[in-house]
Structure formats: structure tokens, C-alpha cells
């Protein structure tokens, strides 16, 4: 005996996971070396990480939204100029377009570099005092919020292995280049606190799941009520039929028959 699906069953069928295609993962732009702030004449290679179809590694590169003719999985910039600054994105054959990566090229003698300007508590901070064309620099010192930190007679990278909130702030480096005392522009380093979810809040479901459960409960109650009501009527009609209690009415026009 064929039966129509109830609203609850239809809702369950529509909400079954996997009944619709999920969005492909995003491609990712990686820098080599990992500095997103450069001086003129520097070189950098942008690499696109993502899934490719078999025998097809063509990549779509964009600079400030404009398509770049390069279709290789990597894009190299040599002898960088200020004009190379901007947002770069990439897209592979089986991955969605990446989030934009901002690259900045500056004119000057000295520049502070870091692979990341935003870190979580417990992660490492790595700072580099970079000179134009890697010219020798001496008596290098790093500063945080105007206060001198580490000092060396030779150039070096400043590492903070386990960052805390107090390690965030404005940083710059200073040194001697060809008898000139030079300083880089300050850059903000952000240390974000670890977010541990509250046990009470984590117990509750997301709002859309709560609404779904409420709707499901309402439809189930309606379906159950309709089911028992129809069943009662059908059972009563069946008993009347068996007991001969069914009354047939005649059309008034048939009185003379």
C-alpha cells in the first residue's frame, strides 16, 4: 500500500548530510622567503597550494583583482619595485580562489620583517632587521614600544619562543649602516589570547540546530496527532461497516421509484 511521505520525513530527507555538494577548499598563497614586507630590489616567490586535476597544474593568478598571464604554480618577483605592492590571489583547478595576500614593497635602507604579525599566545615571534640589498649593518638593536630589547654588534634575528600578551606592541630595529645611524619604521605585532570555550556555553547547540530541533518536534507532534485521528476515524468506519450500521441515503428525486 503506497503512502505519502509526511512533512517530518520530507524534512529529514532534505536535511540528510551529504545530499548537496560541499564547497571546495580554498587555495593558499605561500611566500618564499616568508616576508610580506620587502625593500626595492628584493626577490620573492609566491607559491600556490591547492588541489590540481590529473596532468593539469595550471594556476590562475590575480594581482589586485587583475588576471596575471602567468599560469605556473609559482609566481616570482625579482628586483621588486613599489609597483609590485598589492593583493595577490591564486586558484588551482580543484580548489577555490585563495584569500588575498598583501605584499608591500618600500623604498629605504632598513625594514623590519616578520613571517606573521599576528600570533597566538604560546607561539613564537620572529623579527628580522633587513637592509637594502643586504648591505652590512652593525650595532643592531630591537625596540618594543620605544624600549630597547636585544642588542648585538652584528645583524641578527630577534626570537621570542613563547609569546605572551605583554610581547605585543610596536616594534622597530636600529643600526649603523655606513656610519649612519638608521631606524626602521615601527610595525605593530599582535599577540592574541588563547580562547577556551566556556563549559556552560559549549553545552548548548548552535542556534540553527536548536531551531531545526524545535521544528522537527512540532512537525512530529502534528504528524502523530493526525495519524491517530485518521486511524480512529478509519477504525470506527470499519466497525460500522462490519456491524451493518452504515446508512445509505436516497436522493429526494428518487421517491417515486
Curated annotation (Swiss-Prot):
It is a single-pass membrane protein. Residues 231-257 are cytoplasmic. GO terms for biological process: antibody-dependent cellular cytotoxicity; cell surface receptor signaling pathway. One of its GO terms (molecular function) is IgG receptor activity. It is found in: Cell membrane. One of its GO terms (cellular component) is external side of plasma membrane. Gene3D superfamilies: Immunoglobulins. Pfam families: Ig_2. Keywords: Cell membrane, Disulfide bond, Glycoprotein, IgG-binding protein, Immunoglobulin domain, Membrane, Receptor, Repeat, Signal, Transmembrane, Transmembrane helix. Disulfide bonds join 48-90, 129-173. The keyword Cytoplasm does not apply. Changing residue 181 to N: In clone 334.8. InterPro entries: Ig-like_dom (IPR007110), Ig-like_dom_sf (IPR036179), Ig-like_fold (IPR013783), Ig_Fc_receptor (IPR050488), Ig_sub (IPR003599). Residues 1-19 form the signal peptide. Residues 20-209 are extracellular. The chain crosses the membrane at residues 210-230. The keyword Kinase does not apply. Expressed in polymorphonuclear leukocytes, pulmonary alveolar macrophages and peripheral blood mononuclear cells (at protein level). Found in spleen, and at very low levels in lymph nodes but not in thymus or liver. Residues 25-104, 108-190 form the Ig-like C2-type domain. It comes from the Eukaryota. Glycans are attached at residues 64, 134, 162, 181. Forms a heterooligomeric complex with ITAM-containing signaling subunits FCER1G. Interacts (via transmembrane domain) with signaling subunits; this interaction is a prerequisite for receptor complex expression on the cell surface and intracellular signal transduction. Binds the Fc region of antigen-complexed IgG. Receptor for the invariable Fc fragment of immunoglobulin gamma (IgG). Optimally activated upon binding of clustered antigen-IgG complexes displayed on cell surfaces, triggers lysis of antibody-coated cells, a process known as antibody-dependent cellular cytotoxicity (ADCC). Does not bind free monomeric IgG, thus avoiding inappropriate effector cell activation in the absence of antigenic trigger. Mediates IgG effector functions on natural killer (NK) cells. This is Low affinity immunoglobulin gamma Fc region receptor III-A. The lineage of its organism: Eukaryota, Metazoa, Chordata, Craniata, Vertebrata. The gene is FCGR3A.
Amino acid at each position: 500500500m503506497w503512502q505519502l511521505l509526511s512533512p517530518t520525513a520530507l524534512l529529514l530527507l532534505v536535511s540528510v548530510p551529504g545530499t548537496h555538494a560541499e564547497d571546495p577548499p580554498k587555495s593558499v598563497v605561500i611566500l618564499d622567503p616568508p616576508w610580506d614586507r620587502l625593500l626595492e630590489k628584493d626577490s620573492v616567490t609566491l607559491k600556490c597550494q591547492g588541489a590540481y586535476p590529473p596532468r593539469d597544474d595550471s594556476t590562475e593568478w590575480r594581482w589586485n583583482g587583475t588576471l596575471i598571464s602567468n599560469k605556473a604554480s609559482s609566481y616570482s618577483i625579482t628586483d621588486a619595485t613599489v609597483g609590485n605592492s598589492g593583493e595577490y590571489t591564486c586558484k588551482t583547478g580543484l580548489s577555490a580562489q585563495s584569500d588575498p595576500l598583501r605584499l608591500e614593497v618600500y623604498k629605504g635602507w632598513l625594514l623590519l620583517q616578520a613571517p606573521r604579525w599576528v600570533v597566538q599566545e604560546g607561539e613564537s615571534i620572529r623579527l628580522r632587521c633587513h637592509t637594502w640589498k643586504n648591505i652590512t649593518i652593525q650595532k643592531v638593536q630591537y625596540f618594543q614600544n620605544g624600549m630597547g630589547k636585544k642588542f648585538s654588534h652584528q645583524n641578527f634575528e630577534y626570537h621570542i619562543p613563547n609569546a605572551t600578551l605583554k610581547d605585543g606592541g610596536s616594534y622597530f630595529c636600529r643600526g649603523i649602516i655606513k656610519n649612519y645611524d638608521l631606524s626602521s619604521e615601527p610595525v605593530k605585532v599582535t599577540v592574541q589570547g588563547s580562547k577556551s570555550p566556556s563549559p556552560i556555553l559549549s553545552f548548548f547547540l548552535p542556534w540553527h540546530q536548536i531551531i531545526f530541533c524545535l521544528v522537527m518536534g512540532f512537525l512530529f507532534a502534528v504528524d502523530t496527532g493526525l495519524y491517530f485521528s485518521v486511524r480512529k476515524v478509519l477504525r470506527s468506519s470499519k466497525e460500522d461497516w462490519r456491524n451493518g450500521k452504515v446508512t445509505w441515503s436516497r436522493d429526494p428525486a428518487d421517491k417515486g421509484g
